[in-house]
Amino acid sequence: MLWIDKYKPTSLDKMDYHNDISINLKNMIKSGDFPHLLVYGPSGAGKKTRILAVLQEIYGPNALKLKIDHRTFKHPTSSKNIQITTISSHYHIEINPGEAGSYDRVVIQTIIKEIAQSPPIDSGSLGAFKIVILNEVDKLSKDAQHALRRTMEKYATFCRLILCCDSTAKVIDPIKSRCLGIRVPAPSQEEIEKVLAKVATAEKFDLPSKLAVNVAKQSGGNLRYALMLLESQKAKQYPFQSTELPLLDWENYISQIVKDCFEEQSPARLSIVRGKLYELLGHCIPPELIFKTLLLEIFKKLDHNMKFEIIHWASYYEHRSQIGSKPIFHLEAFIAKFMSVYKKYNQ
């Protein structure tokens, strides 16, 4: 079992940081007034861990007895079959509607209707409703979000929604106004170091403080990434020979792309870079992460006077990538713009 699963807290009392959030959630549950929730924050901050702890607080340990199903839904007006993966207990169901693509509206309406029509039998007055957890709600189509707003009003008596996303910027206002927003910030570097030390003690190995600092720094506030990085380092070399951390394969690949861009600015070089960007996307590296890592790598070699313009174009094309459906077009456009600006600046 991976450390991120083995040492994941299962109750609000066992959380390692953001105790104020845990206290507020416990008080809200005890009051008996449990609204729809919109839980948001950066990746690896602990959003899902807290959501599962909320389920345990409401329903007890049976809420954590999970099963994975592969569900098939039929489109009401066509013969199209829609397949998604669900994680559920007797008290809740968790789905990522984005798996359904443009049919996300159908999946949301069907799931919520099913759940609302079968309230839990043995939950008592504290949880006389079932919970639907929707992941990556910010990536839902506008049509699906409006359908979600109507559905959450209709079935509010026997169903509560917990919406989870990294940012609320793309969530429509009618949904935000019907949910209690809970922001889960990224843990600080010191908090990540404490968790790493705690895991090292439980696993009975010596963790050099310098290595813990480097892992926490490289994680960028992502505790999940920090734990996986430490676990991989221990598997590769223990006792630790060095406290330095090698780059991941995809990070090395992006470093090579940036090197290519600085060496030559031409259509031929752009074509080579495009192929490498395709490789990254083909290996499921998120386009947002590619944009961010590209920019950070470019900044390491860039003159201060150019940084503001490059930031502008990176944010411009990243925004267009969010709106569009073909990230490769916008990644390539950003690289082309960078080559143009860099070549013009050095003439």
Curated annotation (Swiss-Prot):
Superkingdom of origin organism: Eukaryota
CDD domains: AAA (cd00009)
Gene designation: rfc3
GO biological process: DNA repair; DNA-templated DNA replication; leading strand elongation
Repeat keyword on record: no
Subcellular localization(s) per the UniProt record: Nucleus
Species, as recorded: Dictyostelium discoideum
GO MF assignments: ATP hydrolysis activity; DNA binding; DNA clamp loader activity
GO CC annotations, alphabetized: DNA replication factor C complex; Elg1 RFC-like complex; nucleus
Lineage of the organism: Eukaryota, Amoebozoa, Evosea, Eumycetozoa, Dictyostelia
Similarity-based family: Belongs to the activator 1 small subunits family.
Function as written in the Swiss-Prot or TrEMBL entry: The elongation of primed DNA templates by DNA polymerase delta and epsilon requires the action of the accessory proteins PCNA and activator 1.
InterPro entries per UniProt: AAA+_ATPase (IPR003593), DNA_pol3_clamp-load_cplx_C (IPR008921), DNA_Rep/Repair_Clamp_Loader (IPR050238), P-loop_NTPase (IPR027417)
Entry protein name: Probable replication factor C subunit 3
Keyword DNA-binding: yes
Quaternary state and interactors: Heteropentamer of various rfc subunits that forms a complex (RFC) with PCNA in the presence of ATP.
Keywords: DNA replication, DNA-binding, Nucleus
